[in-house]
A protein has these predicted regions:
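C-terminal secondary-structure termini that scaffold catalytic or DNA-interacting sites
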Residues: 46, 164, 170-178
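Conserved tyrosine-mediated DNA breakage-rejoining catalytic core shared by Y-recombinases
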Residues: 11-57, 67-72
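Short pre-functional
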Residues: 1-7, 129-130
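Short, basic (Lys/Arg/His-rich) helix/loop patches that form interaction surfaces
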Residues: 102-143, 147-150, 159
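C-terminal catalytic core of Y-nucleophile DNA break-rejoin enzymes
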Residues: 37-61, 81-104
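Short helix/loop segment immediately N-terminal to the Walker
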Residues: 66-81, 115-117
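Aromatic/pi-system hotspot detector in well-structured domains
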Residues: 58-69, 81-86, 105-108, 132, ...
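Catalytic-site neighborhood detector that most strongly recognizes the C-terminal catalytic loop/helix
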Residues: 145-171
Length: 178
């Protein structure tokens, strides 16, 4: 739902997911070089990604689960604790690593779960494509994805709008008769 890069997501701390409390919830992407899992924000650019109510509720449920696991294990959880953590294997509640995510994806793919050839980055591309197909301006998509320049977004996703326009032209007869 966010279009974040894997490294951005893995570097999040609990306090960087800000609940809306009557306003729009958001994730604050903070560049840092001290993540215990080595996760990094590309080009070290901070940004804010607004999220919907469904993801906000999912976060609240996830945080409750993490807090319960932490309490059972005697592990302290604070705003500066990693957001995405190990829950199935040691070290318990340690920052999730990229290799762990990629291993899980490989397992899911071997089981035939998900589209053929999908990767974590596939979700970022899908997010951007869906936004553009919904009519979101390119500059908004560019900022949401953290691209340094809108031209990067156009280079990667310009075909989406082109294809959409070409599909619309399939109904040329209705345009010609009006």
């Amino acid at each position: 739902e966010t279009g974040m890069r894997l490294g951005e997501a893995l570097g999040l701390r609990i306090g960087e997911f800000v609940l809306g409390r009557g306003d729009t919830a958001y994730v604050q992407i903070v560049p840092r070089s001290d993540n215990p899992n080595g996760a990094r924000v590309k080009m070290m650019r901070p940004r804010r990604v607004y999220v919907g109510a469904d993801l906000e509720r999912l976060f609240a449920d996830y945080l409750t689960d993490i807090a319960c696991r932490a309490a059972e294990s005697g592990i302290a959880v604070t705003d500066t604790s990693p957001l995405l953590v190990n829950v199935a294997r040691p070290p318990l509640l340690a920052a999730l690593r990229e290799t762990t995510v990629r291993e899980k994806v490989a397992t899911l793919r071997r089981r035939g779960i998900g589209p053929l050839g999908w990767t974590p980055h596939w979700f970022r591309h899908t997010h951007a494509t869906a936004l553009l197909l919904a009519g979101t301006p390119e500059w908004v998509v560019s900022r949401r994805l953290g691209h340094a320049h809108v031209q990067t977004t156009l280079d990667l996703y310009g075909w989406v709008r082109d294809d959409e326009a070409l599909r619309a032209a399939a109904n040329w007869a209705s345009y010609a008769s009006s």
